[in-house]
Amino acid sequence: MALDPKANHAAAAAASADNPTAAAAKAKVKVKVLFFARARDLTGVTEAPVEVPAGSTAGDCLARVLAAFPRLEEIRRSMVLALNEEYAPEDAAVGDGDELAIIPPISGG
């Protein structure tokens, strides 16, 4: 008995339709993280892509960024986040294609 790949694909699609939670658990969103001023100095880059599960927050993205760029811990307590050019709390939901800016403390004189 030969396996029919089309039948297997159809069965998998039906299973995903029957269980949207399982399908959502596998869904990922890509967020572009932007680094400014001291954050850029600490990372050595102006931007980096981050992929997180659908339903993630700005804080989830930040956790991934901090894991990838541990030197950012130096400014962690004073940084501000902006999601799509609007200041945002860490519990703000992120979506595919969003931009998350890490804004370090600003000083002047």
UniProtKB/Swiss-Prot annotation:
GO CC terms? molybdopterin adenylyltransferase complex; molybdopterin synthase complex
Under PANTHER family, the record lists: MOLYBDOPTERIN SYNTHASE SULFUR CARRIER SUBUNIT (PTHR33359:SF1)
Single biological process term from Gene Ontology: auxin-activated signaling pathway
Q: Where in the cell is it found?
A: Cytoplasm
GO molecular function list: molybdopterin synthase activity; nucleotide binding
Which Pfam family is an annotated match for this chain, by its short name? ThiS
Q: In which pathway does it act?
A: Cofactor biosynthesis; molybdopterin biosynthesis
Region described as Disordered: spans on this chain? 1-21
State the species of origin: Oryza sativa subsp. indica (Rice)
PTM sites of type 1-thioglycine: G109
**Name this protein carries in UniProt:** Molybdopterin synthase sulfur carrier subunit
Q: How does it assemble?
A: Heterotetramer; composed of 2 small (MOCS2A) and 2 large (MOCS2B) subunits.
User: Any idea which UniProt keywords this protein has?
Assistant: Cytoplasm, Molybdenum cofactor biosynthesis, Nucleotide-binding, Phosphoprotein
Protein family: Belongs to the MoaD family. MOCS2A subfamily.
Q: What is the role of this chain? A: Acts as a sulfur carrier required for molybdopterin biosynthesis. Component of the molybdopterin synthase complex that catalyzes the conversion of precursor Z into molybdopterin by mediating the incorporation of 2 sulfur atoms into precursor Z to generate a dithiolene group. In the complex, serves as sulfur donor by being thiocarboxylated (-COSH) at its C-terminus by MOCS3. After interaction with MOCS2B, the sulfur is then transferred to precursor Z to form molybdopterin.
Which residues, renumbered to this chain, carry the PTM Glycyl adenylate?
G109
- Species lineage, top-down? Eukaryota, Viridiplantae, Streptophyta, Embryophyta, Tracheophyta
InterPro entries the record matches = Beta-grasp_dom_sf, MOCS2A, MOCS2A_euk, Mopterin_synth/thiamin_S_b, ThiS/MoaD-like
Regarding how it is modified after translation, the entry says: C-terminal thiocarboxylation occurs in 2 steps, it is first acyl-adenylated (-COAMP) via the hesA/moeB/thiF part of MOCS3, then thiocarboxylated (-COSH) via the rhodanese domain of MOCS3.
| Top-level taxon | Eukaryota
